[in-house]
Amino acid sequence: MTNVPTDDGPWLVVGLGNPGPGYAGNRHNAGFMVVDLLAERAGSRLKSHRSRADVAEVRLAGTRAILARPLSFMNLSGGPVSAVRTFYKIDPARVIVVHDELDIPFGSVRLKRGGGDNGHNGLRSISSALGTRDYLRVRVGIGRPPGRMDPADYVLRDFAAAERRELPLLLEHSADSVEMLITDGLEPTQNRYHALL
């Protein structure tokens, strides 16, 4: 069983981050970066939408998808995500949220459906707004902060120089995993990407 929803409605792929140029290179904006890459691959650009999100209607792996970046700050992502989902009449089972994950080493990608928010306020806001935790997550590993650095400060800093050299590959793997998730379902995608370092 592949866990791919059987209806032919669109997918909603949400990248989490904070809006504005001052946050663009932050670790917390990994989700935005992946959605931007997906839009670029599809030959599209995200544009302002009445749902308080930047949105693009694209085809990913031959399937209709809505890409979205909430224009609220991370902690308030749920409102725009819920508004986009309602506008396009997308089932929560077809929602994929791409976000940074502290507890996964930098360079790794992990996928799951449902579960807790692990202290991620963007996920907490989305779960509350959707009324369910049962949506797909693509978790982009950013690693733990060094020493005693506050994780809240760490996620709001830009990727380090050494990380920036590896970042394009991480974003490519993350975007690839979104497309495979849509075509093949959760378990095959987990089997492929969880085996990578």
From Swiss-Prot:
Keyword Transmembrane: no
Active site feature: H28
Gene from which this protein is expressed: pth
Protein task: Hydrolyzes ribosome-free peptidyl-tRNAs (with 1 or more amino acids incorporated), which drop off the ribosome during protein synthesis, or as a result of ribosome stalling. Catalyzes the release of premature peptidyl moieties from peptidyl-tRNA molecules trapped in stalled 50S ribosomal subunits, and thus maintains levels of free tRNAs and 50S ribosomes.
Residue numbers marked as site, Discriminates between blocked and unblocked aminoacyl-tRNA: N18
Organism annotation: Frankia alni (strain DSM 45986 / CECT 9034 / ACN14a)
PROSITE patterns listed in its UniProt record: PEPT_TRNA_HYDROL_1, PEPT_TRNA_HYDROL_2
Biological process annotations from GO: protein quality control for misfolded or incompletely synthesized proteins; rescue of stalled ribosome
UniProt xrefs under InterPro entries: Pept_tRNA_hydro, Pept_tRNA_hydro_CS, Pept_tRNA_hydro_sf
Residues holding tRNA: Y23, F73, N75, N121
Signal sequence bounds: none
One CC-aspect GO term: cytoplasm
Residues the record marks as site: Stabilizes the basic form of H active site to accept a proton: D100
Chief localisation class: cytoplasm
HAMAP family xrefs: Pept_tRNA_hydro_bact
Catalysed transformations (reactions): an N-acyl-L-alpha-aminoacyl-tRNA + H2O = an N-acyl-L-amino acid + a tRNA + H(+)
Protein name per the record: Peptidyl-tRNA hydrolase
Documented EC number(s): 3.1.1.29
Oligomeric form and interacting partners: Monomer.
